[in-house]
């Protein structure tokens, strides 16, 4: 019986994490008016010409990057080989 409770608790935590990630993705992709990051984050967080923005979710500030063309990743740290920039 205890094993079933552990499985249920694990499943509930999994659902909560999944819902949180979906919420962040939906908000960052669908909300055109993002707040700019504070200067100390804007200068350090996004790489390769990415633009830092913040979104407040459930009272917590979340900092993300909008990558310049040709880059991807949470901090725009990876070259996007699927969408290279013409040089």
UniProtKB/Swiss-Prot annotation:
A molecular function GO annotation: receptor ligand activity
Tissues in which the protein is found: Expressed by the venom gland.
EGF-like domain ranges (all copies): 33-77
Main location: secreted
Gene3D superfamilies: Laminin (2.10.25.10)
One GO cellular component, as annotated: extracellular region
UniProt entry keywords in alphabetical sequence: Disulfide bond, EGF-like domain, Glycoprotein, Secreted, Signal
Stored InterPro entries: EGF-like_dom, Gurken/Spitz
Matches recorded under Pfam families: EGF (PF00008)
Signal sequence range: 1-32
Entry comment on modification after translation: O-glycosylated.
PANTHER family recorded: KEREN-RELATED (PTHR12332:SF1)
UniProt record similarity statement: Belongs to the EGF domain peptide family.
UniProt name for this protein: U18-myrmicitoxin-Mri1a
Lineage, uppermost ranks: Eukaryota, Metazoa, Ecdysozoa, Arthropoda, Hexapoda
